Curated annotation (Swiss-Prot):
SUPFAM superfamilies: Thiamin diphosphate-binding fold (THDP-binding) (SSF52518). Its EC number is 1.2.4.2. This is 2-oxoglutarate dehydrogenase E1 component. Its cofactor is thiamine diphosphate. The keyword Oxidoreductase applies. Homodimer. Part of the 2-oxoglutarate dehydrogenase (OGDH) complex composed of E1 (2-oxoglutarate dehydrogenase), E2 (dihydrolipoamide succinyltransferase) and E3 (dihydrolipoamide dehydrogenase); the complex contains multiple copies of the three enzymatic components (E1, E2 and E3). The gene is sucA. E1 component of the 2-oxoglutarate dehydrogenase (OGDH) complex which catalyzes the decarboxylation of 2-oxoglutarate, the first step in the conversion of 2-oxoglutarate to succinyl-CoA and CO(2). One of its GO terms (cellular component) is oxoglutarate dehydrogenase complex.
Amino acid sequence: MKKNTLEKWFNSSWLSGNNQNYIEKIYESYLINPKSVDITWQDKFSDLSKKRKNILKEEKFVYKNNSFKEIKIDKQEILEKKINYIINTFRKKGYKKSLIDPLKLNEQKKYKYLEPTFYHFSEDELKKTVKIDFKNSSQYEIKIRDLYEQLNNKYCGSIGFEYMYIENSFEKKWITKHIELFFKENLFIKKEKIRFLKEILYGETFEKYLGKKFSGTKRFSLEGGETLISILHEIIRYSKKNDVSEIILGMAHRGRLNVLVNVLNKNPQVLFNEFSGINIPKEYSGDVKYHMGGITKIKNDKKKIYLKLAYNPSHLEIVNPVVLGIARASINQLKISENKFLSINIHGDASIIGQGVIQETLNMSQTEAYKIGGTIHIVINNQIGFTTSNPKNLRSSKYCTDVAKMIQAPVFHVNADDIEASIFAIQLALKFKKKFKKDVFIDLVCYRRHGHNEVDDPFVTQPIMYKKIHNHPTIGQIYSNLLISEKLITSNDIEKIIEKYTTKLVQGKNVLSQERNITFQNGNKNFFIKKQKENTQLNFLNIKDLLYSINTIPNSIEVHNRVKKIYQERIGMADGQILLDWGTAELLAYATILKEGISCRLSGEDISRGTFFHRHAFIHDQNNGSIYVPLQNIEKNQGKFEIWDSVLSEEAVLAFEYGYSLFPSNNLTIWEAQFGDFANGAQVVIDQFISSSEQKWNQKSNLVLFLPHGYEGQGPEHSSARLERFLQLCAENNIQVCIPTVSSQIFHLLRRQIFSNVYKPLIVLTPKSLLRNNVARSSLEVLVNENFKNVINEIDKNQKEVKRIIFCSGKIYYDLLEYRNKCDINNVLLIRIEQLYPFPKDEILTILKSYSYVQDFIWCQEEPHNQGAWFYIKDLLSTLLPLNSHLNYVSRPSAASPAAGHILIHRKEQEKLINNAFNFKIA
């Protein structure tokens, strides 16, 4: 092939028919604006226009079907394409140009594709009236210049609508319609505007009053973001109109006091007393005032709306999944529509993008186990995180709300200085949530007038930012001036509003008028209440029938052979041929609870089958994949049984289940870790909520944690639930910590949790190898006739002339028992402590009365010396032992890691440990 011919072929090959659609799209963009395409394409199209003929026809290598045809330019068509292009560009990218920063910290960027010059409109074209599909109406006549101005006002004003990344076209069209039809000037009438102004002035005056009355005291002011108060009131107004029965708020400390007084109507004098240290509660340790929550009843005609503010610690964003759990419990237990419940989570700009629990929580939002019909997210975006204000140091994305994109949630960025735009944004968000039952985000861009707290001097680290803030008018001033200019109010009227509100603060009176019918209740007394149900007597025949019932699978279901064998064995257990294993006893416990009309909810990774293949609460049909759940088919009036294989999360899932457990009803809520080792992924939930919420907030929970625990050679990440950490948290009867070793014990423990008067979280270190071990099985008679034993005494009556008593907990008991039997030892007692906290002092003393002569006592544990129960239990046991006796420990040596990584090392350690327990010599 000649060189010049080859070059011509190469230069024209891009015109292949295979590329036609692609080239036409690029050519259309070129005709709208030549600079919008790559320079290479500009050259080719420019050359093509000059030649005005198909260059392929010049060569013998032309494609015979003449696939590329010369494009004729239709000016009207190009004009229409330009108009459609500019409309779609504003919808997709208008938010980038929006005026959302009240401080104007950064120079406003110019986006050429949002300017009319980019599209090469002639002056005549700008004046031309066209018919377009704008505002989602059928046809709309408008001049091109006016169209541009409308687009600019709607999409590049005080709200940046970021939503076109959503894949669902119906959702996008719905949002577009509401923006283009309803977002306009003069949205609100005089009455509404005056109401907004009052709410802003209340929030502003409250902060100033607190600042003067308690100067230099931390209050985590809302100043700069008072628009939040009006937004929350708008949510209440929406709830009244839309038959919402409950609203639950989750928020951090920023602005919390303002919300308590100006939204929940907390009495100001009560708050002032908290500042002054007056009337401190004595029955619990309490918490700082900006962590407190509460509940308010709002009368709505003859109905009531319950507005709750969830208690939370300083650990940012962890309250989010707790709020969702509270919401799901209300929806389930009250059997109400998702649209009758509003979940509102209020975030900070640094924490929403910085805290991983947000991603975990959002991931749960549309899953069957955790969805609640969507959440309204409001970000108090004060453009700073403590002392960090450079976005490059705060996040790797442009916006703090970019995490919303992972769940296809729309984001409305709004300038908090524009109150009316902020109200429109929350109205749109509420409508979207109701329509699509999905999460939606309000990015309320504001500022923080003071430092991180009122003691902090922000000028030290943000001098430029705070010079702007110092000279920036307050939101109240801005809106007051606007309404004065609109002749809707006078400065004298405004002074009277402030004066009247201030008088209420001075007098310590509730600031919200009584005709609004809002009263504040002390959440520490009545936030969550447990209604106890009396225990019911078990009947052997009834329990036997129940065991048959939950293990009988319909013939129409094709059961996996391994599962079929398990269920056949369970029928044998009902017949009395086989003792009950752990999984059977556990499921039977749920069945007895469900028969009483009490609901059970279980969640965790692999929980329906069980990590160790022992539960099988779900039966998967091997032919069609359908699922049969025996515990959902006991009888008509049974309680609701839910068991959910959770998302792969510990922190958010456990927090959700904690929130669920707070609902004031008889409900057994259980979270199971895949292995107990992984529970520390949710350590903040354990520390800040489960172990301490009752003492801090008088908030009660009966949540159950199943934590598989036991040293079996599986290495440092699959051996220990970190028992020592739970025991370190034990005080003031806050939780229960149990390590049951027999199947009957888990049966009784679960029933005790729901039927007893004790309403505390329960931590259960569950077994692994014992799940199917014959030595850990129980008879049906034991399940019916006995109760949970905090301590299990020696079971071998042949142990005589006792010289040593070994105390232990958990699986190691069976290793000790095996060694004792193997070595034919008959003078050492093995006593199992099944409940470590509250410590069963009386039961142990009762047992020891028979052995007052024994001087040699051992605490034996599998865990290393610095872990496990030893440092918790040594003083407790020592005070119970006879005089002049000795208490020693046997354990693995102190170690940084919980367990050895190799099975051979594990076996040697275990062998030495068991041998030492029997052969330990007292010095």
